[in-house]
Amino acid sequence: MNKMSPLYVLALCCLATTVFAKYDCTNNGGYGCKYGGTCHFYGFCICPKGFQGEDCGLKTELISTAANCTAECKNGGTCYESDRCYCPHGFIGDMCEIPDTVARCAPDRMIIEAYRPLGFVGEVYMFQNRKSCALKQVPSDIRDMMKLERVVLHSDKTECALTRTPDTPKLGDVTMKTTVVSTHNYNQFGPRDSIMDVSCVHTNSFQGSTKEITETAFPFRMVALDMNGEPVQALAANESIILQFEPVGIPDVRGVMVEYLEVYSINANSNEVVSKTIIENGCVLRTAQQHLEIPIRNYSEMXRQGTSWVARSAMRAFILLPGDHCYSSLDYASVPEVPR
């Protein structure tokens, strides 16, 4: 049995402000009426008896009552066949939990995602430029849907750059925002197309009270060592360093290993965040070694006292942002027995 103790230094959340257009069966590319429904001139479906929904895709007799439904349909989804959800236009996913156009946050970038029907023949792009800021098709993780995506770095200085608003919505927060255009026909914008705002919020994780934490309250001890095993406080770039972690104050735990290690720096003036994931699922990422141009090892070995196994991440000191401190986000896995 593994006991995980995640420690997160940087808090991220994703907020999307989206204006959804109504379903319009006159649009090209997979927006018709199903099961013999008739598309009205004004864009709504006239469904045959026994069917309902914006595209007539829901058979009335299959709709489940609240007592018979085991699915938690969100965003106005309708439960049918006890455990399935029929989603309104603008939402997808098994539980209708995913907006069809949304932004996700990463420490240094925004990922804009748009899901459209497989027959979609239109375009999705950032409003600044239809061609150079377009979302491109990528492999989809939603069945029977096409996925379009664009990754924009927070530091992007091109015409596709994001709008940055500090201290929004709260003091210390930073909101990254852009406007996305979705059309149903290539190189055309009509009254049935949509324009929507999407945004990501970096929440302020630096406010709080100072509190002394004992070894009993804090389950692991971390120390930075030089190659001779002596503690260090500061290093020059490219000097060897070992980050050592050992369990303290947890009964029956005989060892620890690093499952995930991410380092990042925050520019003191612009709040720009630069991050690099070094270890994931206990393995050193080759891309991190190549990008940082340093050797990295992640391993466990017996402590000097011979009573427990300690985790060690060995590398050379490096700089992400000149003049700014490095921070870390870590996941540890504790081992209840000494490995044999």
Swiss-Prot record:
Cross-referenced PROSITE patterns: EGF_1, EGF_2, EGF_3
Entry keyword annotation includes Metal-binding: no
UniProt KW keywords: Disulfide bond, EGF-like domain, Repeat, Signal
Tissue localization of expression: Component of the organic matrix of calcified shell layers.
MF terms in GO: signaling receptor binding
PANTHER family: EGF-LIKE-DOMAIN, MULTIPLE 7, EGF-LIKE-DOMAIN, MULTIPLE 7, 8
Protein name (record): Gigasin-2
